[in-house]
UniProtKB/Swiss-Prot annotation:
It comes from the Bacteria. The lineage of its organism: Bacteria, Pseudomonadati, Pseudomonadota, Gammaproteobacteria, Enterobacterales. This is Ferrochelatase. The keyword Cytoplasm applies. It catalyses: heme b + 2 H(+) = protoporphyrin IX + Fe(2+). Keywords: Cytoplasm, Heme biosynthesis, Iron, Lyase, Metal-binding, Porphyrin biosynthesis. SUPFAM superfamilies: Chelatase. Its main location: cytoplasm.
């Protein structure tokens, strides 16, 4: 019996199509309308989103995107397309398609792309190393919606996450060591993960534990003493409590306490984007230096590095 033709769906969050208020508004409207992201009752959320948040945030966020926009486009899209191309080159017999939860290319277009190539089994790799209901589960929901009305659906392998995968940890270790070799070993390595509301964790999201799993394996592999590493959470939104400690407040505190040299890595981001290139590399650098620090480096995401691509190859070929 011949083996079913398998395709790979690479999934990520998404990005505006242009660094303009109009494009950012379209993107944020879709992103912030997902109940996996914001679960406030719609009767309360819609007026706030449409009447206050989108009009105020869209122009401001557009300016931030303009500061990091690359010649080829949005950093997240540029690196995601490179990942897609590199993975396809490594797996010539397995079609690869990129799909975003919000914006273009959509997850639906990616699924249609694969099915048009007579794929009978799809391996879904959501490029979020640590599971969260607001990221990985949102991909699951959309995939279920896409397939809900089909008479014939393909076999599905859904990779929940890879927080402690050996090849993922090894790639992070080598990235950190390369930064240490270039800039000197810092007084402290800060591991900054994207935050989620504390309430989501209280209700069962194991994201904080998966972040701790990554941190534990990374610190062990690096051989650093515990006092030279901290784990924090960034990018909080809204007024309710999010996972702590907060990255920005921690960096201010470190500068005030006399820590002079920090390097910051964001292990939860598979590709550099606004939250790493602007929030971490620029905003938080300023917070640390203004508080008394003297040396600050951001360690880039794994992006389309060869080690990262090999990790993807391993995940999609061994977990199906």
């Amino acid at each position: 019996m011949s083996q079913a033709k398998t395709g790979i769906l690479l999934a990520n969050l998404g990005t505006p199509e242009a660094p303009t208020p109009a494009a950012v508004k379209r993107y944020l409207r879709q992103f912030l309308s997902d109940t996996r992201v914001v679960d406030t009752p719609r009767v309360l959320w819609w007026p706030l989103l449409r009447g206050v948040i989108l009009p105020i945030r869209s122009p401001r966020v557009a300016k931030l995107y303009q500061s990091v926009w690359m010649e080829e486009g949005s950093p997240l899209m540029v690196y995601s397309r490179r990942q897609e191309k590199a993975l396809a080159a490594r797996l010539p017999d397995m079609p690869v398609a990129l799909g975003m939860s919000y914006g273009k290319p959509s997850l639906e277009s990616a699924v249609e792309n694969l099915l048009s190539q007579d794929v009978e089994h799809i391996v879904v790799l959501a490029l979020y190393p640590q599971y969260s209901c607001s990221t990985v589960a949102a991909v699951w929901d959309e995939l279920a919606r896409i397939l809900a009305t089909r008479r014939h659906i393909p076999g599905i392998t859904f990779i929940r996450d890879y927080a402690d995968d050996e090849m993922y940890i090894a790639a992070l270790v080598n990235s950190a060591r390369a930064s240490f070799a270039k800039h000197g070993e810092p007084d402290l390595l800060l591991l900054s993960y994207h935050g989620i509301p504390q309430r989501y964790a209280d209700e069962g999201d194991d994201y904080p534990q998966r972040c701790r799993d990554t941190t534990r394996e990374l610190v062990s592999a690096l051989g650093l003493p515990p006092e030279k590493v901290m784990m924090t959470f960034q990018s909080r939104f809204g007024r309710e409590p999010w996972l702590t400690p907060y990255t920005d407040e921690t960096l201010k505190m470190l500068g005030e306490k006399g820590v002079k040299h920090v390097q910051v890595m964001s292990p939860g981001f598979s590709a550099d984007c606004l939250e790493t290139l602007e929030e971490i590399a620029v905003q938080n650098r300023e917070f640390f230096l203004e508080a008394g620090g003297t040396k600050y480096e951001y360690i880039p995401a794994l992006n389309d590095s060869p080690e990262h691509i090999e990790m993807m190859v391993s995940l999609v070929t061994t977990r199906r």
